[in-house]
Amino acid sequence: LQAITSNPVTTTTLARIEPEEAEPGWRLHWSTAGHLPPLLITPGRPAEYLFAEPGVPLGVDPEQPRPDHSRHLPPDTTVVFFTDGLVEHPERPVDESLAQLAGLATAYASLPLQEFVQVLADHHPSDGHDDLAILALRTPRL
């Protein structure tokens, strides 16, 4: 890990999606390095976070193995990856902001993906003083 700082530590998520062989839909595989969990929005259900055992941030212990996770995704499911700048606010616990983001995602899940992401960016629960990045994908309908 090459760094331009004296504290070379960062968080991230590595994920891939592939067609599911056992049932209709897709399979999400992911591993985190201390990053916030992805947000899953399945049609007709409230948004939920994919809480799973996190790995340590990059730069902490490169020899430590990272846990891998897997989840079935039905057709038309949205997965949202985001930086902490979307939810961190100095005046409230991050769990409260995560709940607010999940509620927002549930309320606007039926929007086309680009509009959905724009709503999350425009109405984020953070104070707006940190970097903000959102990556969302929606599985195709079968």
Give short role names for the model-derived ranges.
Residues 1-56, 66-67, 123-126, 136-137:
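Catalytic core of PPM/PP2C metal-dependent serine/threonine phosphatase domains
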Residues 59:
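Regulatory/sensor and coupling segments of signal-transduction and defense proteins
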Residues 49, 54, 62, 67, ...:
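Active-site-proximal, acidic helix/loop segment immediately C-terminal to a metal-coordinating Asp/Glu
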